[in-house]
Amino acid sequence: MSVLSMRTTRGGLALALICSSLTIARAQTATTRIVSAANTFLSTLDQKQRQNVLFAFDDEKQRTRWSNLPTSLVLRAGVNLKEMSAAQRSAALALVSSALSRRGFEKVEQIMEGDEVLKIKEGNNSIFGKDLYYISILGKPSEKDPWMLQFGGHHLALNITIAGERGVLTPTLTGVQPALYSMDGKTVRPLGQESDKALALLNALDDTQRKQAILSYRLADLVLGPGQDGKTIEPEGLKASAMNERQRAMLLDLISEWADIIHESAATVRMTELKADINETWFAWSGPTTATPGNSITAYYRVQGPHVVIEYAPQRLGGDPSMHVHTMYRDPTNDYGRRLTAK
């Protein structure tokens, strides 16, 4: 081997090692940041609040105590934002923010603001509102040992498992009502991309592909929603191996609306996994194939692969299904981080 080739090889190896180190450092930095935010939040609580917010990591009752419904209809455990001081609330939201990407936390805030809009629309109905969200921690916040952060209320259930440098967001439920509202003179659609990207993918299919993707029956709600842990369903619709490269890229971009909610380090790992699975991933559609410009679709759709199930389900409760949406994000092999924490 020539001196030049040796230098090139060594340089490439050094660069690879540096890149690898930076990748690990970013992941560790993310975990360190989340643990620090968790400890800061806990330090703001009094003894009773700490007792209410902390659970054993193996507490299955608490782990699965999440719902789409308002907290007055399905009781949550933990500490409610409404019961916190301004400093405690700020620390709680800083903790949630630390575990999410910037766009992910923005989506969470917009879902909560949507519930505030619903509260006002319903005559200040006390079962709605952006302060009716609970936070809880399962296990001890740690950079090494697994633990879990939960945050949720009406139309939101984040289940975030932290295991060393790995982070898992499944199962997570996002929803919104109204799906379109105005704030500070701007139109807000918290789950608008989830609708628009799916419709764009459907419209990118040719006639043969559309016939495969569109189901012959109607689905009106989530199949794998709250209370359906461990349930399995057969893939339906159009398999991505029958798509062209552009269509598969559009499917991955759609999936990223959920995968990228978690912080960037974990999202990168997750998207790499899902990209490797893409040819074994299915896209199914049920319902109308058009939407009013600027509004969300009124059709159900599902994305399903070896390590992911995503559902989008408009709701007829409240009238216009384009204005009331439920979505579900699962990993049938790793909900609650079970693959990472199995002994």
Where are these regions (language model features)?
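Bacterial N-terminal signal peptides
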Residues: G12-S21
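Sec/Tat signal peptide C-region and signal peptidase I cleavage site
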Residues: T23-A27
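A cross-kingdom marker for long, charged
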Residues: Q28-K343
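Bacterial N-terminal signal peptides that target proteins for export
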Residues: M1-L13
